[in-house]
Amino acid sequence: MDAIHIGMSSTPLVKHTAGAGLKANRPRVMSKSGHSNVRIDKVDGIYLLYLQDLWTTVIDMKWRYKLTLFAATFVMTWFLFGVIYYAIAFIHGDLEPGEPISNHTPCIMKVDSLTGAFLFSLESQTTIGYGVRSITEECPHAIFLLVAQLVITTLIEIFITGTFLAKIARPKKRAETIKFSHCAVITKQNGKLCLVIQVANMRKSLLIQCQLSGKLLQTHVTKEGERILLNQATVKFHVDSSSESPFLILPMTFYHVLDETSPLRDLTPQNLKEKEFELVVLLNATVESTSAVCQSRTSYIPEEIYWGFEFVPVVSLSKNGKYVADFSQFEQIRKSPDCTFYCADSEKQQLEEKYRQEDQRERELRTLLLQQSNV
């Protein structure tokens, strides 16, 4: 049976589904790579909130902004304290033109310009200590300023080092080595109609305590007539009989049973591509080497779900007795040999569609009556 490769722009390859190309540009809450598409807007004092949580703000910065900020911070502290040293020397009379008075002791030796004060600040803060410029006992204010500079800049260096280590140690990059299939399929698993996705760990280091869950996001109208734009419903996934903590050493297929309790129970081959929903899938796991908790995310919209297909097997046994995961087959699907579940009786489908339309009309009428009663 021929396999079909599903890539980032290969949705039109599936020709058996009517309307496969419709609504392809619908908005997504989450991108395929797991990044949020929600824009936070019109929040009073949002910059103040970011400053109050400065640690998280700096860690979340991109590297180019972080490096620019830290470089600018060091240069500004050198210059600021250099200006203060220059002011102290000016007030003390160390910058008078002409020959220095024989009995005059300057606050800082060899500092007779703003450039010299800047270099003294830089040498003191970085503990270079060339030995040419040095502070004397003549000015207690200069001594106090030197102590304050070293204490303040030490705290800045501790903060910078901590944020660098925290950003490097974050398990974000580890989560990027967890691969989700680009599409999902609806097929039969153990005689039950299931929605199936495929997940793989791209590294040899194991992920322990894996938990995969899903959230169905769709518009919902309550009995009171309130319209919830992104109602969340839990979608439970299983893998074999170890649904609590699967052993993700090889690419695995996770399935969700489309039974009476499923929020996707109304899906049919005819209405799948016309539905308005987004299925967000989250995999939480603990990294074996660091014990850090990481999360990998993706989402599926109706155009990325294929009815009557199944994934091509990825794992095989080599001649020397080793298990091999062929990732060239990871994004390939093929038609399911059992076509009974998508070749259902047309009268039954028409009856189900009639009931759904009647329920929708009744809900709209209830909403209209409620709105009129509130006038």
Curated annotation (Swiss-Prot):
One of its GO terms (biological process) is potassium ion transport. It holds the Pfam family IRK. The record marks 157 as: Role in the control of polyamine-mediated channel gating and in the blocking by intracellular magnesium. The chain crosses the membrane at residues 61-87, 140-165. One of its GO terms (molecular function) is inward rectifier potassium channel activity. One of its GO terms (cellular component) is monoatomic ion channel complex. Channel activity is regulated by variations of cytosolic pH; reversibly inhibited by acidic pH values. Inhibited by Ba(2+) and Cs(+) in a voltage-dependent manner. This is ATP-sensitive inward rectifier potassium channel 15. It comes from Homo sapiens (Human). The gene is KCNJ15.
